[in-house]
Amino acid sequence: MSGMHGASREALAAARERLDALTDSTSVDAGSLADELAAVTALLHREVSLRRVLTDPAQSGEAKAELAQRLLGTQVSGTAVDLVAGTVRSRWSQSRDLVDALEQLANIADLTAAQKRGRLDNVEDELFRFGRIISSNTELRAALTSRSATTAAKSELLAGLLGSRAERTTERLVTRLVTAPRGRSLESGLESLSKLAADRRDRMVAVVTSAVPLSDTQKQRLGAALAKVYGRPMHLNLDVDPEVLGGIRVQVGDEVINGSIADRLEDAGRRLAS
């Protein structure tokens, strides 16, 4: 989804603005809207010919919107129909981009529901921790990505793992990702969800790795320092790695701030060798 260009990028931005306007209303159930958008995503993923018709540049935006309204009018709420109709009115560079966009809107709606309940921070942290669990547990990853396992079996496994321990939003997001990966790896999907969660508060995400857990004071100071450097609020995803001999390693996007003893030793070794 981050790979959208040109018309699709503009269309996605417009769709996100429409979604934000809708979910700002207290009368809109963001969680239910997420379910409906996810159902439309699944439909268009399956029905390639329909997807192509709804993104055909030779058809007027109004004609495509009317088609979406006829097809979905009795299947989902009026709010969901209006949002999808507005989305297909836009021009899309590729038909797949429309499906990616609707999936992203579903995820944002779920995150908005969590934000309204004051639980967004919990969801962000749980997504990060689940990603770490997946990266260190090859058996669990294999079970969740197995092509031979049924959707029901994967959902049941996730319910057992997350149901009583995690936020409902976290379970919903991860279950959708696992049961409908649409060609993505589990890791990249979780990373995308984490970025969306951070975007809900217009924050950047810093992955902080330290040899020992940071104190609350250290976390607050680091967050404030990074916010000052980057000019935006910063959410810290914390990880402990005993192999980091001391100090802290911080990664923000593709940028790595090397402040650990291990890095300083490696830099010193390179200087001696040169």
UniProtKB/Swiss-Prot annotation:
<dbReference type="GO" id="GO:0015986">
    <property type="term" value="P:proton motive force-driven ATP synthesis"/>
</dbReference>
<comment type="subunit">
    <text>F-type ATPases have 2 components, F(1) - the catalytic core - and F(0) - the membrane proton channel. F(1) has five subunits: alpha(3), beta(3), gamma(1), delta(1), epsilon(1). F(0) has three main subunits: a(1), b(2) and c(10-14). The alpha and beta chains form an alternating ring which encloses part of the gamma chain. F(1) is attached to F(0) by a central stalk formed by the gamma and epsilon chains, while a peripheral stalk is formed by the delta and b chains.</text>
</comment>
<keyword id="KW-0813">Transport</keyword>
<dbReference type="InterPro" id="IPR020781">
    <property type="entry name" value="ATPase_OSCP/d_CS"/>
</dbReference>
<keyword id="KW-0139">CF(1)</keyword>
<keyword id="KW-0066">ATP synthesis</keyword>
<keyword id="KW-1003">Cell membrane</keyword>
<dbReference type="GO" id="GO:0005886">
    <property type="term" value="C:plasma membrane"/>
</dbReference>
<dbReference type="InterPro" id="IPR000711">
    <property type="entry name" value="ATPase_OSCP/dsu"/>
</dbReference>
<comment type="similarity">
    <text>Belongs to the ATPase delta chain family.</text>
</comment>
<keyword id="KW-0406">Ion transport</keyword>
<protein>
    <recommendedName>
        <fullName>ATP synthase subunit delta</fullName>
    </recommendedName>
</protein>
<keyword id="KW-0472">Membrane</keyword>
<comment type="function">
    <text>F(1)F(0) ATP synthase produces ATP from ADP in the presence of a proton or sodium gradient. F-type ATPases consist of two structural domains, F(1) containing the extramembraneous catalytic core and F(0) containing the membrane proton channel, linked together by a central stalk and a peripheral stalk. During catalysis, ATP synthesis in the catalytic domain of F(1) is coupled via a rotary mechanism of the central stalk subunits to proton translocation.</text>
</comment>
<dbReference type="GO" id="GO:0046933">
    <property type="term" value="F:proton-transporting ATP synthase activity, rotational mechanism"/>
</dbReference>
<dbReference type="GO" id="GO:0045259">
    <property type="term" value="C:proton-transporting ATP synthase complex"/>
</dbReference>
<dbReference type="InterPro" id="IPR026015">
    <property type="entry name" value="ATP_synth_OSCP/delta_N_sf"/>
</dbReference>
<dbReference type="Pfam" id="PF00213">
    <property type="entry name" value="OSCP"/>
</dbReference>
<keyword id="KW-0375">Hydrogen ion transport</keyword>
<comment type="function">
    <text>This protein is part of the stalk that links CF(0) to CF(1). It either transmits conformational changes from CF(0) to CF(1) or is implicated in proton conduction.</text>
</comment>
